[in-house]
């Protein structure tokens, strides 16, 4: 007999060789039905794995994040199974879990399009209903290679060749087998709420020199209700797509001459200026001096900073006069150069620097997505150089600034995470203990709840991540606060302490909105293009009922502009209904409509974008009304 301890501290006896599914059944049939896998002594295992010794057991169900991930990973296998049934000559490659779903890459011998997805999905449902048990076997590497070679799965052979392990796991359901680390669901019957969503191209291993594969995306949920809710969200997200709204509002465009880099139009630049000016004022409030550093630097700087070894493949490089240069992928090393121009005393610290720095990263073309994933973007970077004793207070201030910014931009629902030490890291455990505690203390001081994520910190220090939830419930990773033990040492960022000794400065990195391009894309989707008054590219559209009011329209327009209102004058010889509809589609917050009565009484009639009639008032009163909203960030 063996003893199994449960999360509530209770201990029960079972026969040796029992599995997690059996344990779940002994508690309740409904629990067994919901069980996807289990943690056995902190190791995630398949639900059918035998337990032969005393252990701690935590069952994983579809309600757990790990359970949902296993469900989705198994659904990716079901997709591959269905594709092989329908297109036997297809080669399968990889099928990982992604946010809210999964994908699988295939090498089809025939042409496949979006129209084929319903057929594949139908086959998936047929296979799931067969309730095929899912099992695995562990085989030597050589046997796994021979197995997949015999099936003509050359990509699987290549994957196995690249893995250092000598033992491979092969999962099987019905007549389909796939290479995988697992774990997987016990039976295909639990896959009931899934849908294939789109199809795209993807190069094998992300290398454009390799074959272009067909990537099929899908989503999978614990219940049909969850699936329906998610699909409704996708439908709403489609309406909010910043690329479509950006075109309607004439904000920006992309073209093949400069892939992944936006061309900003007048209206887009107006939004950009509001975001940048707001952040500049916020930085001033929190004592950050603004700097501007070179876009290009000698490659040796990136070698010293460590970026060359980490980002070389994603860096744009050039040569000039027999010297190697690179366009910066990050702003940090050039900021350190500004710090290093002076000898600093501990009395000078903290020194806070902010930069709206343009960076370039050679992202794969297939990953580019409007403003949300680009090759050139402007980062609202901040770098603080301080003593170890000052770190906690500086992080407290950064957290305060982040929350102020997000609330002003209309994000009131967010999650905060602390990414803790990874296995491979620099620095001793004592330094990491202290650093991680500082981040926790700073969040506690701001009454912020947070989650801990062991192993997800950078090798050079732990970090805080801010995840914002938008109007339709999507989560966006936005700001970061990062402790850095590495770069100050590498680049010689030092100060003289009170004993006259040279010490390495502590360096804090922070980005609040992050990429301005991405943040503006987020804002557009969050507000569905109906930006709050203070951010709207055009705040008021002025129009007359007939051309007889043209002179008065011009007079009102000039008065609005003199009061700092971003106004548009519409003197076209069109019906007033047409003008109202057009400016409503352009998401202009307020429409000023002028007729004979308004002209004679020197007043204006105001209509909100929503269609609400605000009645009549003087231009001065309207400007005061607008200014109050703008100041309140409404």
UniProtKB/Swiss-Prot annotation:
Chain residues that bind Zn(2+): 332, 383, 509
Query: Does the UniProt entry include the keyword Ligase?
Result: yes
Q: Is tRNA-binding given among the entry's keywords?
A: yes
| Cofactor(s) of this protein | Zn(2+)
Q: Where in the cell does this protein reside?
A: Cytoplasm
> Which GO terms are recorded in the biological process aspect for this UniProt protein?
threonyl-tRNA aminoacylation
Q: What is its main location?
A: cytoplasm
Write down the InterPro entries for this protein, in alphabetical order: aa-tRNA-synt_IIb, aa-tRNA-synth_II, aa-tRNA-synth_II/BPL/LPL, Anticodon-bd, Anticodon-bd_dom_sf, Beta-grasp_dom_sf, TGS, TGS-like
Record key words, sorted: Aminoacyl-tRNA synthetase, ATP-binding, Cytoplasm, Ligase, Metal-binding, Nucleotide-binding, Protein biosynthesis, RNA-binding, tRNA-binding, Zinc
Q: Which family does it belong to?
A: Belongs to the class-II aminoacyl-tRNA synthetase family.
Protein name according to UniProt = Threonine--tRNA ligase
Q: Which organism is it from?
A: Francisella tularensis subsp. holarctica (strain OSU18)
Name of the coding gene: thrS
């Amino acid at each position: 007999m063996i003893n199994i301890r449960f999360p509530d501290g209770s201990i029960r006896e079972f026969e040796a060789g029992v599995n997690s599914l059996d344990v779940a059944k002994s508690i309740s049939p409904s629990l067994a039905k919901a069980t996807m896998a289990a943690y056995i002594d902190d190791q995630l295992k398949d639900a059918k794995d035998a337990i032969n010794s005393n252990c701690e057991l935590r069952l994983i169900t579809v309600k757990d994040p790990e359970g949902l991930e296993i469900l989705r990973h198994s659904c990716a296998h079901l997709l591959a199974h269905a594709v092989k049934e329908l297109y036997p000559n297809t080669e399968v490659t990889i099928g990982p879990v992604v946010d809210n779903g999964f994908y699988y890459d295939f090498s089809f011998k025939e042409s496949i399009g979006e129209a084929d997805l319903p057929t594949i999905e139908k086959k998936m449902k047929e296979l799931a209903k067969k309730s095929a048990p899912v099992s695995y076997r562990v085989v030597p590497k050589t046997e796994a290679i021979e197995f997949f070679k015999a099936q003509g799965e050359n990509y699987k052979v290549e994957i196995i060749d690249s893995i250092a392990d000598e033992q491979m796991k092969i999962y099987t359901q019905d007549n389909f087998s796939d290479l995988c680390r697992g774990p997987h669901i016990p039976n295909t019957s639990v896959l009931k709420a899934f849908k294939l969503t789109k199809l795209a191209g993807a190069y094998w291993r992300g290398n454009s020199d390799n074959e272009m594969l067909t990537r099929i995306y899908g989503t999978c949920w614990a219940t049909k209700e969850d699936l329906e809710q998610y699909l409704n969200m996708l439908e709403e997200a489609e309406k909010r797509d910043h690329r479509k709204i950006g075109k309607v509002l004439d904000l920006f465009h992309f073209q093949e001459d400069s892939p992944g880099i936006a061309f900003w139009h007048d209206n887009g630049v107006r939004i950009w200026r509001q975001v940048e000016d707001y952040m500049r004022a916020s930085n001033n409030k929190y004592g950050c001096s603004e700097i501007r550093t070179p876009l290009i630097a000698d490659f040796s700087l990136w070698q010293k900073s460590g970026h060359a070894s980490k980002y070389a493949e994603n860096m744009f490089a050039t040569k000039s006069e027999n010297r190697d240069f690179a366009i910066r992928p990050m702003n940090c090393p050039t900021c350190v150069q500004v710090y290093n121009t002076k000898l600093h005393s501990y009395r000078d610290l903290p020194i806070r620097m902010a930069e709206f720095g343009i960076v370039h990263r050679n992202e794969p073309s297939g990953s580019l997505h409007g403003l949300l994933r680009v090759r050139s973007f402007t980062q609202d970077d901040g770098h603080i150089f301080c003593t170890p004793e000052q770190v906690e207070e500086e992080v407290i201030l950064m957290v305060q600034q982040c929350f102020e910014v997000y609330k002003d931009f209309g994000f009131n629902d967010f999650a905060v995470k602390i990414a803790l030490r990874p296995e491979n890291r620099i620095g001793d455990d004592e330094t990491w203990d202290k650093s991680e505690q500082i981040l926790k203390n700073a969040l506690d001081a701001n009454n912020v709840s947070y989650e801990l994520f062991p192993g997800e910190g950078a090798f050079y220090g732990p970090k805080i991540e801010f995840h914002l939830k938008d109007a339709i419930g999507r989560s966006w990773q936005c700001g970061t606060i990062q402790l850095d033990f590495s770069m100050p040492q590498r680049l010689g960022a030092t100060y003289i302490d009170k004993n006259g000794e040279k010490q390495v400065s502590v360096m804090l990195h922070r980005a609040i909105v992050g990429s301005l391009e991405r943040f503006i894309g987020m804002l557009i989707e969050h507000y569905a293009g109906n930006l709050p008054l203070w951010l709207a590219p055009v705040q008021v559209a002025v129009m007359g009922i007939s051309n007889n009011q043209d002179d008065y329209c011009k007079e009102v327009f000039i008065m609005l502009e003199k009061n700092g209102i971003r106004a548009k004058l519409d003197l076209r010889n069109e019906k007033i209904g047409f003008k109202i509809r057009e400016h409503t589609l352009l998401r202009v917050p307020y429409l000023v409509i002028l007729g004979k009565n308004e002209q004679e009484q020197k007043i204006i009639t105001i209509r909100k974008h929503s269609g609400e009639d605000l009645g009549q008032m003087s231009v001065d009163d309207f400007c005061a009304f607008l200014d109050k909203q703008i100041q309140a960030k409404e």
